[in-house]
């Protein structure tokens, strides 16, 4: 049997909710009887709590009306920690990072950025835990985290980091991707591009260009968002009455010519969708070395619309993510969590757009 909740615990809870604007100035606190029933305590216990809050100038009890919050909030400046390790590999995280920093200058929060943006995924893995621990020790008000990818045991490490932040009672918003805990419900807010739609859009584009068979190429230990893109591709291909099976999935190093050779390419009828632009750029070079002509034998495209994409030998068709909006909505969700960190988790998927270039058009 659970122990009786003390009046101090109830007092601390209500006071915290007032300070976090769960009960903003001018709002009514729950009736004493309602709160007594919620906490399974007597009505005089709640009356004692409300009297203490009134003595501190946080509320005003009015007979026949109720208890009104009178506390006027000051312009609190929050401190948020950034854990965006992908900024060392992809431009999208640099854009998201810059937007968060830009908004911090104009908003009511400051950002701590410890980095972990090294080009090597393994180095980022070594750094990320210490940065997370640093943020927790500094008692930041919230954390933005883009889960690690491209390293072994990334799933376990991501879950470990999220759990540590959660146990510290710090609000957390995941950016760009979820952590792999399916089929369990994710306990955190997530903001990303709509990856299922991104897969569907790219598949439809290549099919419309005359491709009769599509392949998907990605590197080992890629992010969970890859699964959603694959699902979107499969859905679109099957809607067109064609097959997309495990034989169309290639997980490996795009520099490995022997592995690249395993892809069945029917000249003028094959399209390759890569997990990102960096994979596509390397794969284009490998295909060229094998005598496979882009725009003649095969079409190819990627994701993230990196700056160099339009400067490749064959300018690369890509999918542009709404990076600045991802950052903006992430801030909104973290501010929401500051008011009540127990709110039901939200997943927001934003629309991106395809940027069509030479690499996805047969000549």
Language-model segment annotations:
Residues 13, 187-188, 260-363:
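Flexible loop/turn connectors
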Residues 91-107, 198-201, 224-243, 282-286:
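Short, solvent-exposed amphipathic alpha-helices that sit
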Residues 178-181, 186-216, 254-261, 280, ...:
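Hydrophobic alpha-helical segments within soluble ligand-binding/sensing domains
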């Amino acid at each position: 049997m659970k122990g009786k909740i003390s009046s101090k615990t109830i007092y601390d809870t209500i006071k915290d909710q007032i300070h976090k604007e769960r009960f903003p100035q001018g709002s009514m606190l729950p009736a004493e009887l309602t709160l007594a029933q919620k906490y399974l305590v007597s009505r005089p216990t709640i009356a004692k709590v409300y009297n203490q809050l009134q003595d501190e100038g946080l509320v005003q009890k009015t007979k026949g009306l109720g208890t009104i919050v009178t506390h006027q909030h000051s312009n609190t400046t929050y401190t948020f920690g950034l854990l965006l390790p992908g900024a060392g590999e992809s431009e999208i995280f640099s854009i998201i990072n810059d937007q968060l920093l830009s908004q911090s200058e104009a908003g009511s929060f400051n950002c701590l950025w410890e980095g972990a943006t090294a080009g090597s995924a393994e180095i980022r893995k070594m750094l990320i835990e210490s940065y997370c621990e640093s943020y927790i020790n500094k008692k930041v008000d919230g954390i933005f985290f883009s889960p690690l990818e491209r390293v072994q045991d990334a799933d376990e490490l991501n879950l470990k980091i999220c759990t540590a932040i959660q146990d510290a009672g710090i609000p957390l918003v995941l950016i760009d991707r979820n952590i792999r805990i399916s089929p369990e419900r994710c306990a955190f807010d997530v903001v990303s591009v709509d990856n299922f739609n991104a897969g569907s859009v790219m598949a439809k584009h290549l099919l419309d260009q005359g491709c009769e068979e599509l392949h998907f190429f990605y590197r080992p230990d890629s992010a969970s968002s890859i699964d959603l893109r694959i699902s979107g591709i499969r859905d679109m291909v099957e809607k067109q009455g064609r097959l997309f099976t495990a034989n169309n999935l290639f997980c490996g190093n795009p520099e490995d010519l022997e592995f690249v050779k395993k892809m069945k390419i029917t000249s003028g009828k094959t399209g390759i969708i890569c997990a990102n632009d960096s994979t596509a750029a390397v794969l284009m070079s490998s295909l060229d070395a094998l005598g496979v002509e882009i725009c003649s034998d095969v079409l190819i495209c990627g994701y993230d619309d990196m700056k160099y994409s339009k400067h490749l030998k064959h300018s690369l068709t890509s999918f542009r993510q709404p990076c600045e909006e991802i950052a903006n909505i992430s801030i909104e969700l973290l501010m929401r969590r500051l008011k009540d960190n127990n709110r039901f988790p939200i997943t927001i998927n934003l629309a991106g757009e395809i940027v069509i270039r030479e690499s996805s058009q047969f000549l």
